[in-house]
């Protein structure tokens, strides 16, 4: 055997040793997720164990279970053509320690879409090992604002808005003592950059909470942001004013009715139906007010649309409009009923008999309504004159 044969045997033996050693390795790296801010840079390292030469190996970085190649190193070259386009200009493989089996993937300008798991794969021939590292992209926004809807029949509606969070933050209402107030509704959406826009509402039905704070927290970094609003007690005074107005109107109606009827009693000695016309109209008015007020209360107290529904505000405005329309209808209907009632009452009054006939049986049980002569003068001197009139177009109605 010559020198060439000896050299060939040495090379083959060396390659065999390299192959055997290469088939006996594992890949290690970071065990905890890597927290990285939105728009920042991150480095992911992986290491062969035991440490060994890795220049002759194929090194790949994948996402989503090998479906998205992030970086490829093979035969000592970086192959950008086999990676997805969004990582071509934003990734770099640091190979300073590749002789010891360590490489580092650097990703620039992180986006919310970069959040997830990354597979680091070392491959020699058909043998390969991998390590999985997770990136947690975080974003916190200080842009917050509270919108207050105009007070309505349900109360005061507060809306807290904040955008630009990742991942989805924890959101809640708190009072001035730090106690949690249950939110009426919560909603979120994601923009084209996959950042979360948060919305939370709170319906305050009483003035017990004067200072309200909207509180958000990033659950990964525990960073907090908050904004507060102080509510004036005047926002809830409209309820007391409304109750006082209705109470005052009710007492005024009762007082007017009693005063008028007492006056009629003092003047005529009895509460005759012919004298207390205003009592009848007042009763009609009170009945109408009670009926319509009852309908309004039923509409207001009945829960038709949940507060969390997007049509809640429209439903509230509809109730307010209906309330105004009902009040206008009350006034119109009462005016119309009163006009028709007193007009008909005046048309059917007719004429009454002379005083000296009031004790006679005929005059005591009837009232003569004479349409043809109601605007003239009819003279009756005695009951015989009444009996001698014979048939006539008189309408006999009971006396009241």
UniProtKB/Swiss-Prot annotation:
Repeat listed as a keyword: yes
Keyword Repeat carried by entry: yes
Extracellular topological domain residue ranges: 22-240, 302-321
Main localization category: membrane
Residue intervals passing through the bilayer: 241-261, 281-301, 322-342
Gene3D superfamilies linked: Immunoglobulins (2.60.40.10)
Superkingdom field: Eukaryota
Signal peptide residue numbers: 1-21
Cysteine disulfide links: 46-120, 160-214
GO BP of this protein: negative regulation of T cell activation; T cell activation
InterPro entries per record: BTN3A2-like_Ig-C, Ig-like_dom, Ig-like_dom_sf, Ig-like_fold, Ig_sub, Ig_V-set, IgSF_BTN/MOG
Tissue: Expressed in skin, thymus and mammary gland.
Stretches assigned to the Ig-like C1-type domain: 139-225
Entry's localization field: Membrane
GO cellular component, one term: membrane
Positions of glycan attachment: 197
Membrane topology: Multi-pass membrane protein
Topological domains, Cytoplasmic: 262-280, 343-400
Molecular function GO labels: signaling receptor binding; T cell receptor binding
Keywords: Disulfide bond, Glycoprotein, Immunoglobulin domain, Membrane, Repeat, Signal, Transmembrane, Transmembrane helix
One of the Pfam families matching this protein, by short name: C2-set_3
Other facts noted in the record for this chain: Encoded by one of the 11 copies of Skint genes clustered in the D1 region of the chromosome 4.
UniProt record similarity statement: Belongs to the SKINT family.
Name assigned to this protein: Selection and upkeep of intraepithelial T-cells protein 2
Source organism (scientific name): Mus musculus (Mouse)
């Amino acid at each position: 055997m010559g020198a060439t044969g000896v050299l060939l045997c040495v090379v083959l033996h060396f390659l065999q040793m390299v192959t055997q050693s290469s088939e006996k390795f594992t890949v290690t790296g970071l065990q905890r997720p890597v927290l990285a801010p939105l728009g920042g840079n991150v480095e992911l390292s992986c290491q062969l164990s035991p440490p060994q030469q890795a220049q002759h190996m194929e090194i790949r970085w994948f996402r989503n279970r090998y479906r998205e190649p992030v970086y490829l190193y093979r035969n000592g070259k970086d192959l950008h053509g086999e990676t997805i386009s969004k990582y071509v200009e934003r990734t770099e493989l640091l190979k300073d320690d590749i002789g010891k089996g360590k490489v580092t993937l650097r990703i620039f300008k992180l986006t919310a879409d970069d959040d997830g798991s990354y597979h680091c794969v070392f491959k020699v021939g058909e043998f390969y090992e991998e390590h999985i590292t997770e990136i947690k992209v975080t974003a916190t926004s200080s842009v917050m604002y509270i919108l207050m809807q105009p007070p309505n029949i349900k109360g005061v509606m507060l809306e807290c808005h904040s955008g630009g969070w990742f991942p989805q933050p924890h959101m809640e209402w708190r009072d001035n003592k730090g106690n949690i107030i249950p939110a009426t509704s919560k909603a979120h959406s994601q923009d084209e950059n996959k950042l979360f826009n948060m919305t939370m509402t709170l319906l305050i039905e009483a003035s017990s909470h004067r200072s309200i704070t909207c509180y958000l927290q990033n659950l990964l970094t525990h960073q907090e942001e908050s904004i507060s609003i102080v509510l004036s007690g005047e926002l809830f005074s409209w309820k007391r004013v409304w109750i006082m107005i209705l109470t005052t109107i009710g007492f005024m109606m009762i007082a007017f009715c009693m005063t008028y009827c007492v006056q009629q009693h003092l003047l005529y000695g009895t509460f005759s139906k012919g004298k207390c016309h205003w009592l009848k109209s007042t009763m009609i008015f009170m009945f109408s007010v009670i009926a319509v007020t009852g309908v309004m209360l039923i509409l207001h107290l009945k829960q038709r649309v949940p507060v969390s529904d997007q049509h809640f505000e429209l439903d509230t405005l509809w109730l307010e409009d209906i309330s105004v329309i009902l009040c206008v209808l009350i006034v119109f209907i009462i005016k119309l009923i009163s006009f028709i009632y007193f007009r008909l009452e005046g048309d059917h009054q007719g004429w009454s008999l002379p005083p000296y006939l009031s004790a006679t049986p005929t005059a005591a049980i009837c009232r003569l309504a004479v349409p043809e002569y109601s605007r003239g003068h009819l003279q009756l001197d005695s009951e015989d004159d009444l009996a001698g009139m014979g048939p006539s177009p008189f309408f006999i109605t009971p006396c009241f």
